[in-house]
Amino acid sequence: MTALPPHSPAILPAQPFDALLDLPDDTRVHTLSNGVRLLVIHQPGAPGVSVSVFLRSGGQHEPARWGGISHVIEHMAFKGSATRNCQQINLDAERLGAEVNAHTDRDHTAYQMRGLAAHTLPLLRMLADLVLHPTFPQEELDRERQVILHELTDVEDDAYAVAWRLFDQAAYGRHPFARPVIGSRSSIEKLTRQDLLDHLQQRCSGSNLIVAVAGPLTAEALLPEVEAGFGHLAAGAPNQVEPARWIGGVRIKRHGGSSQSQVVLGWPIARLDQLQPADAVAAAVLGEGMSSPMLDELRERRGLAYHINVVAEQQELGGQFVVEGATSPEQLPEFLEGSLALLRRHADRVEAIDLERARHQLLVRSLHDRERPMRRLEEAAVDLFVLGRLRGNRERLEALQSVDREAVRSRIETLLLQPPALAITGRAPAGTREHFAGLLKRFELPLDPVSPLSS
């Protein structure tokens, strides 16, 4: 429980929220006849522009034999199109001063360019060419496959990344939601050029594609270019996957490159489409900032870790409430005990000052996000894919403002009724599984009856 120091101000009124509810809603969506959506954040007078294409195709949409194929396609999109080879793609973007980026997630792939507002239309044309007309030259695929295998080696050498991979497996078993986006060494080595072409044809359709622009041009000015570049796509059906079922369990793996214990501990929470704002507030209550209970107690007062984070991840197929950090093997039992004790304590009572802090921290984060066009575009695109609509500024802030202490306490109490998933990499003392099971019993928390101490 966080004590209220004598010099702390009284709990602040709600005016900071009220003053921000009426921020202008500058986001618009237009849908083409084939289902392609044009998402525009209008920024009059802005000298720069952010242009993105989001494809509803990621790791969760892949068959097991093609694990990592979305990520390979993302890499290969820049290696040649119907009108440009790899070098021409790089030159055409860089002669305009454009920054080019792309990434693959579980639920979508993003292709992004940021440049001068005067170059908005050329950037749109380039993205249409790269995303819709890649040629996947065999010689480029052979080279890029090696690059991706090196990237995979980096991931495998990172105890933190391995801990998250093990956590996903403990939480969701063999569901596609648990598979690593980068794939496996065997699947990457086996992918062929025809596999890439087939997968793109299956997944890239109008209903699964969003063209997004943040800059000074209006949607009306952009529509002709979007129609020309993307209007020929077949509409297709939305790429959908059944939600993941939470399993829970323990995964521990020794990682020779780490002298610490990397810990990822979590429980199931609401999916994104279930719109449960109390989950995010609960994560902020427990672990946002140095004065939060997790950091104040486990780091500042007990010195159990340097890095501790609490996050509520709500995605299309599942949600997870996670406490993650790194500690020494000797302090691992105390770190686990302290984390569970704080969760159990907050399932009984949430302090007003912690709720005040969390709400204001989330408010400030929301304001910072408004200043990051790429982040706003991606967040809005995910809303369109999952919810079929945008959540405006007022809706988001009113949802945050509506969360009270009882809502946070109740959400923590509810998540603790489910079996946790725990992943530990690096070093862990002998008997860690049994110790964790004993802690769960002590705090009257459930352990998965199917595989309580899985390895």
Task: Annotate the PLM regions.
Residues 19-22:
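Short loop/turn motifs at secondary-structure junctions and domain boundaries
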Residues 42-43, 52-54, 237-293, 446-455:
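His/Glu-based metal-binding/catalytic segments typifying zinc-dependent metallopeptidases
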Residues 57-66:
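Short pre-active-site segment immediately N-terminal to the catalytic Zn-binding motif
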